[in-house]
Curated annotation (Swiss-Prot):
<dbReference type="Pfam" id="PF00124">
    <property type="entry name" value="Photo_RC"/>
</dbReference>
<dbReference type="InterPro" id="IPR055266">
    <property type="entry name" value="D1/D2"/>
</dbReference>
<dbReference type="GO" id="GO:0009523">
    <property type="term" value="C:photosystem II"/>
</dbReference>
<dbReference type="GO" id="GO:0045156">
    <property type="term" value="F:electron transporter, transferring electrons within the cyclic electron transport pathway of photosynthesis activity"/>
</dbReference>
<keyword id="KW-0007">Acetylation</keyword>
<feature type="site" description="Tyrosine radical intermediate">
    <location>
        <position position="161"/>
    </location>
</feature>
<dbReference type="GO" id="GO:0016168">
    <property type="term" value="F:chlorophyll binding"/>
</dbReference>
<dbReference type="GO" id="GO:0009635">
    <property type="term" value="P:response to herbicide"/>
</dbReference>
<feature type="binding site">
    <location>
        <position position="215"/>
    </location>
    <ligand>
        <name>a quinone</name>
    </ligand>
</feature>
<feature type="propeptide">
    <location>
        <begin position="345"/>
        <end position="352"/>
    </location>
</feature>
<dbReference type="InterPro" id="IPR055265">
    <property type="entry name" value="Photo_RC_L/M_CS"/>
</dbReference>
<keyword id="KW-0597">Phosphoprotein</keyword>
<keyword id="KW-0793">Thylakoid</keyword>
<feature type="binding site">
    <location>
        <position position="189"/>
    </location>
    <ligand>
        <name>[CaMn4O5] cluster</name>
    </ligand>
</feature>
<keyword id="KW-0150">Chloroplast</keyword>
<keyword id="KW-0464">Manganese</keyword>
<feature type="transmembrane region" description="Helical">
    <location>
        <begin position="274"/>
        <end position="288"/>
    </location>
</feature>
């Protein structure tokens, strides 16, 4: 009899736990994805803060030349970063218990791999949690779909690119100047500026910013007057009100006359779908471009593609970019190799 009561009590506790986890009445929705999201993101955030402040230098290139990225070693907020895992580790899974000591783990950049792996799991679970909450509220799933764009971008630079290049040391450093260094080296090695998927990403990000500003300014400029001159326009809106707060016909008429009639949306639903889809698709393409360049399917090479009747090269902007790429490649990882691969792998051009 006692055993039966205990089983019923435990089942009741589990049922109450399940109900609490999936309840949409909580101030913050947890969900089953949240059960994994919360510890992984807390771990990634905690280790990042500690490592950014106090972790020792890391032998990123695997040549016994540690690189400092931490505040206590003389860096500031801009120059500081969590330095990627050492090239000596490559793609090996490198938890703390795989190192001979904590000092070795820190020297080889173990915190970077710990942060990146937990962060990746956390943001994937956050996306799943968005879908889960939408499902429970009877909403459509497009919030999670939109969030998949930054998830894809983070996955590309933190997971796919290191896999393609064969080492976590090629991942993006976790810092401001480290991000810029990653971008410069990426351009030098992969010519990303000449990759069509990157161009689509630029169109998505800048186009999305433009469309967001246009939409916000049009709505703000065509608000329906509900207040006096002495009150804030924002006081004219009541949360949950049924009627429109702005005149879409006026906004449509203005924009149609400013550009041309069919440049303006006359359907609010299709307008907002467009505002969401444009940057999301652009960022998807950029993430896809990073993922293909990870395996050295690089941007277009139009170097020395224009010549005169005598066979002499007429430089184009592609050649100017190529010169910049060579200069950047010479400068990075100065002691890891003695000569840039692009210069060392071809016959030296004749100077005379």
């Amino acid at each position: 009899m006692t055993a039966i009561l205990e089983r019923r009590e435990s089942a009741s506790l589990w049922a109450r736990f399940c109900e609490w986890i999936t309840s949409t009445e909580n101030r913050l929705y947890i969900g089953w994805f949240g059960v994994l999201m919360i510890p992984t993101l807390l771990t990634a955030t905690s280790v990042f803060i500690i490592a950014f402040i106090a972790a020792p230098p890391v032998d990123i290139d695997g040549i016994r030349e540690p690189v400092s990225g931490y505040l206590l070693y003389g860096n500031n907020i801009i120059s500081g970063a969590v330095v990627p895992t050492s090239n000596a580790i490559g793609l090996h899974f490198y938890p703390i218990w795989e190192a001979a000591s904590l000092d070795e783990w820190l020297y080889n950049g173990g915190p970077y791999q710990l942060i990146v792996c937990h962060f990746f799991l956390g943001i994937c679970c956050y996306m799943g949690r968005e879908w889960e909450l939408s499902f429970r509220l009877g909403m459509r799933p497009w919030i999670a779909v939109a969030y998949s764009a930054p998830v894809a971008a983070a996955t590309a630079v933190f997971i796919i690119y290191p896999i393609g290049q064969g080492s976590f040391s090629d991942g993006m450093p976790l810092g401001i100047s480290g991000t810029f260094n990653f971008m410069i080296v990426f351009q030098a090695e992969h010519n990303i500026l000449m990759h069509p998927f990157h161009m689509l990403g630029v169109a998505g990000v800048f186009g999305g910013s433009l469309f967001s500003a246009m939409h916000g300014s049009l709505v703000t400029s065509s608000l329906i007057r509900e207040t006096t001159e002495n009150e804030s326009r924002n006081a004219g809106y009541k949360f949950g009100q049924e009627e429109e707060t702005y005149n879409i016909v006026a906004a449509h008429g203005y924009f149609g006359r400013l550009i041309f009639q069919y440049a303006s949306f006359n359907n609010s639903r299709s307008l907002h779908f467009f505002l969401a889809a444009w940057p999301v698709v652009g960022i998807w393409f950029t993430a896809l471009g990073i993922s293909t360049m990870a395996f050295n399917l690089n941007g277009f090479n139009f170097n020395q593609s224009v010549v005169d009747s005598q066979g002499r090269v007429i430089n184009t902007w592609a050649d100017i970019i190529n010169r910049a790429n060579l200069g950047m490649e010479v400068m990075h990882e100065r002691n890891a190799h003695n000569f840039p691969l692009d210069l060392a792998s071809v016959e030296a051009p004749s100077i005379a």
